[in-house]
Amino acid sequence: MYLFMISCYVMMIFNLINLFISVTMGIWNFSFLGSNHAQFSLFAILVFVLTETLVMYFFIATGKSIKIILTEQNTSDATKLWEEIKYIKKLIFPQIMLTISLIGGLYIFYFGYIISNTTNDNILQYSWVLLPLLLVSIIQHLWSLKIKNDSFKMQIDIVSKISSGS
């Protein structure tokens, strides 16, 4: 489980770096590792979706394993711990889905509509929509990283309580 969680953290850091590079490529129009903005952004969005899916899978898989252990214990403490697991899921899954929707929507709006329908001369006409959407997406993504970190900590605390038998 710890190796799985560490791989989630590594992917989240790699994902944040990719998104930062992609945004800066769009603003300053430079190539990175021989790829243009569209090519690198496609890579970044694939890493983003993979990372968010991996984090969701972590909480689903560990939650299922914890449920099996707690069901065997059948105590009031086990019920309380299961309620904490459900609270974590209610906390993290909506944040992940909102982040996926915002970043994915930004990607589709930018590359699917703006780039395909404009030239470099008139791309600024969409900045009134693009920039607020970009800011909201970045803020939401950073907020979801905090929520994920807190959720990982809570999940580990629950596993520690189960391991210690309390």
Say what each PLM segment does:
Residues 27-38, 114-123:
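Membrane-interfacial hairpin junctions
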Residues 2-10, 80-107:
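Loop-to-transmembrane boundary segments
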Residues 69-95, 158-166:
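Short membrane-interface loop/juxtamembrane segments of multi-pass integral membrane proteins
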Residues 17-25, 95-120:
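Alpha-helical transmembrane segments and their membrane-interface junctions
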Residues 16-20, 35-64, 135-144:
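Hydrophobic alpha-helical membrane-embedded segments
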